[in-house]
From Swiss-Prot:
One of its GO terms (molecular function) is glutaminyl-tRNA synthase (glutamine-hydrolyzing) activity. Heterotrimer of A, B and C subunits. The lineage of its organism: Bacteria, Pseudomonadati, Pseudomonadota, Alphaproteobacteria, Hyphomicrobiales. It is an enzyme of class 6 (ligase). This is Aspartyl/glutamyl-tRNA(Asn/Gln) amidotransferase subunit C. It comes from Agrobacterium fabrum (strain C58 / ATCC 33970) (Agrobacterium tumefaciens (strain C58)). Belongs to the GatC family. Disulfide bonds: none annotated. One of its GO terms (biological process) is glutaminyl-tRNAGln biosynthesis via transamidation. Its EC number is 6.3.5.-.
Amino acid sequence: MSVDLATVKRVARLARIAVSEEEAQNMLGQLNGILGFVEQLSEVNVDGVEPMTSVTPVEMKKRADVVTDGNKADDIVANAPATDRDFFMVPKVVE
């Protein structure tokens, strides 16, 4: 697969990128190089190869998924002018 100059200009216009003729020519070479590399990757036989997310198998450390109150109630209300237990007290605004 390769890209021509008209396609480069069209994509630049769709992306709302202003490119000069010289920049478009430069991008044409770069995009064709990238597409050539992708074509090489598609030629690699990967039958029987398991998908992986890391070069070495790594088991992620996970914390227990336990619901807690965060144990921060005292810290949260510490600077409030008025509190009742772990709740903020505010002046009545609706009659």
